[in-house]
Amino acid sequence: QTNFSTLEAFFVGSAPLYDALRAFAAQRPLRMHMPGHKGKPLPAPELAAIAAIDFTELPPTGDLFSGGGAIGAAEALWAEVFHMDSCLFLTGGSTQGVHAALALACKPGETVLLDRGSHRSAYNALALLDLKPVYLERPWLASEGITGPISPSAVAQALEEYPDAKTLCITSPTYYGMLSDLPALAELMHRRGGVLVVDGAHAAHLPSLGNDHLSAA
């Protein structure tokens, strides 16, 4: 009998995808699919419950590419938490999200204002989409030993120098937790008919801390 108490501590209220995985695991199905551990307990006791509900895409568990079902319910719940109109879970990690966002925001050959501290996925997107970068350097904060935020004034200056740039792509928060003023940056870009693209791979916790106004969502 699998002990799910360690997992349930993470869930408060509705958890449609977790509930669907638990319900399917309770049927004790014959696992003729990935992953190779077949739901058997892993060496670390704290991972036993995770292995029990570790399924691939199946009719009872849902498919990230088609939506609906438990995955669709989970996406709707996530959108509600982040105050978004809708949500789509990525099928290939945050790198895929950066690629998709820039592909939607830009046309080949366009100029992009790019945070110099961006993840390599943004640089890969430049090559894949034939985009021209204008790099924004972050200020060095000597007392903290890290770089600071991308400031609205720096972006405004870059827009004056490169008026054809219609997309700003930054990371917020950074790996070190540095947040940029997203509302101000978004207003600045929207006022010029532009788009703000944010790599928020490290921002999922912000709404739970009451800082959802600093989240890209």
Residue ranges: model-predicted function:
Residues L47-Q96, G117:
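Conserved N-terminal alpha-helix of the aminotransferase class I/II PLP-enzyme fold
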Residues K38-A44, S86-F89, I150, A154:
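Short acidic/polar alpha-helix capping motifs at helix-coil junctions
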